[in-house]
UniProtKB/Swiss-Prot annotation:
This is UDP-N-acetylmuramate--L-alanine ligase. Its EC number is 6.3.2.8. One of its GO terms (molecular function) is ATP binding. Cell wall formation. It catalyses: UDP-N-acetyl-alpha-D-muramate + L-alanine + ATP = UDP-N-acetyl-alpha-D-muramoyl-L-alanine + ADP + phosphate + H(+). It comes from the Bacteria. ATP binds at residues 114-120. GO terms for cellular component: cytoplasm.
Length: 471
């Protein structure tokens, strides 16, 4: 049974969230009546309003109006007045993943999972499918620069979605193709232990129907181990690993471009296909790996090598994924969402390969619990940065944990041998501290999932202002 047209007005609590906004937009484009509420008048909220979706700022029971269905994310607390009112009215309350699953039933679906790289990989798969004329519908966890949004309504039979594993609800998604980029011990507050995370990703792949397939990264030990345990589903492996079915090789980094070859081997027939001199306008082996996952999907769906190369070369990137926000005095300033040690290490390694000068990393740790559980990993992930500026922890609603803060992390980084790690006590001091260390040819990379993105946007003009004062 499919989602009927006459479901009435759908109300989203927290509609401005990156996942919720995409689902709301696609529902609206399908002709359903959609409205919602959010705590702030964010860019996502403004974008939805421009499309004709009514959005209330603040959560109040009366916002429900004539709603027949209410959609919530796991971030919405049971004490939310709109949620309480919905239950008093006996309205169906639908989890975000459940509504996404309903949308996926309209299409053949590709779900992109993994601890890191999901958003970029989702964007790359969408780009290659579009280049191949498949006109996909897309719901992503980040703003795709080519679309200016995280959602796209296509006319084709394929849908590409980012599968969020944080609360386990990604297992509800009816995917025909399941991609796993990597598996790390994240979200243990939900899963309890790493074995439960492993089990969830195994189920994610085994949930695909017999006519579907999994695409799995052979470079990641946890994923490689999982490949060996899946017996009854078709699996395509990818990576730099010589044993991968879809392998990238001959990598060259040219500024902020990556140039590489891909070899595709069909295990059953022995057939080989070479894609030579592929160009992607993003640096870094982690991004090449994500592109190779997208190539594996596109190739299996019958997209030509020529269209794959064309799509890859035209890829416009994802907002907050090594996004250039401006330049000052020959210094380039980048904004990145990286907030886990694995992500930070990969971004800084990519910056090191692309930059002719020095790397200045500015990081705002996100959540005390994450910093506490991964403290030693954070202390070791900045080695590719010549200078490190660490801002206070962005709490995201958490209580502080004694002894777990940015000053402690600075001390640990320095005791581990790093030559230049400093505490950045406030955003107001950032321009002066950057101006003190940055020279022409350097990269300044701001990393984090909190408010640091606004610092990255403001920094180029702030630095210009400092130059004006000194003149």
């Amino acid at each position: 049974m499919k989602l009927p047209k006459a479901i009435g007005l759908v109300h989203f609590i927290g509609i401005g969230g990156i996942g919720m906004s995409g689902i709301a937009e696609v529902l609206h484009n399908l002709g359903h009546k959609v409205q919602g509420s959010d705590q702030s008048d964010s860019a996502n909220v403004q974008r939805l309003r421009e499309k004709g979706i009514e959005v209330f700022v603040g959560h109040r029971a009366e916002n429900l109006g004539d709603a027949e269905v209410v959609v919530v994310s796991t971030a919405i607390r049971k004490s939310n007045p709109e949620l309480i009112a919905a239950r008093e009215k006996l309205l169906p309350v639908v989890r975000r993943a459940e509504m996404l699953a309903e949308l996926m039933r309209f299409r053949n679906a590709i779900a992109i999972g993994g601890t890191h790289g999901k958003t970029t990989t989702t964007s790359l798969v969408a780009t290659l499918l579009e280049a191949g004329g498949l006109d996909p519908t897309v719901i992503n966890g980040g703003i795709i620069n080519a679309y200016g949004t995280n959602a796209r309504m296509g006319e084709g039979e394929w849908m590409v979605v980012e599968a969020d594993e944080s609360d386990g609800t990604f297992l509800k998604l009816p995917a025909d193709v399941a991609v796993i980029t990597n598996i790390d011990p994240e979200h243990l507050d939900h899963y309890g232990n790493f074995d439960a995370v492993r089990a969830a990703f195994r189920q994610f792949v085994e949930n695909v129907p017999f006519y579907g397939f999994g695409v799995m990264c052979l470079d990641h030990p946890e994923v490689q181990s999982l490949v060996g345990r899946i017996e009854d589903r078709k699996i395509i492996t990818y990576g730099e690993n010589p044993q991968a079915d879809v392998r990238f090789k001959n990598v060259r980094i040219d500024g902020t471009r990556s140039i590489f070859d891909v070899e595709i081997r069909r295990r059953r027939t022995g057939q080989r296909t070479e894609l030579k001199g592929l160009v992607m306008p993003m640096p870094g082996r982690h991004n090449i790996s994500n592109a190779t996952a997208a190539i594996a999907v596109a190739n299996r769906l019958g997209i030509s090598s020529e269209d794959i190369a064309k799509g890859l070369a035209s890829f416009g990137g994802v907002k907050r994924r090594f996004t250039l926000t401006g330049e000052w005095n020959g210094v380039q300033i980048f904004d990145d969402y990286g907030h886990h040690p694995v992500e930070i290490k990969a971004v800084l390694k990519a910056a090191r390969e692309a930059c002719k000068g020095r790397i200045i990393a500015v990081h705002q740790p996100h959540r005390y619990t994450r910093l506490a559980s991964l403290f030693e990993e954070f202390a070791a992930c900045f080695n590719d940065a010549d200078s490190i500026l660490l801002a206070p922890v962005y709490a995201a609603g958490e209580d502080a944990i004694e002894g777990v803060d940015s000053t402690s992390l600075v001390s640990r980084i320095k005791s581990g041998g790093h030559r230049d790690a400093r505490f950045l006590s406030s955003a107001e001091l950032l321009p002066e501290m950057v101006a003190e260390v940055a020279k022409p040819g350097d990269f300044v990379v701001l990393l984090g999932a909190g408010s640091i993105t606004s610092w990255a946007a403001a920094l180029p003009k702030q630095l210009e202002g400092l130059s004006g004062k000194s003149a």
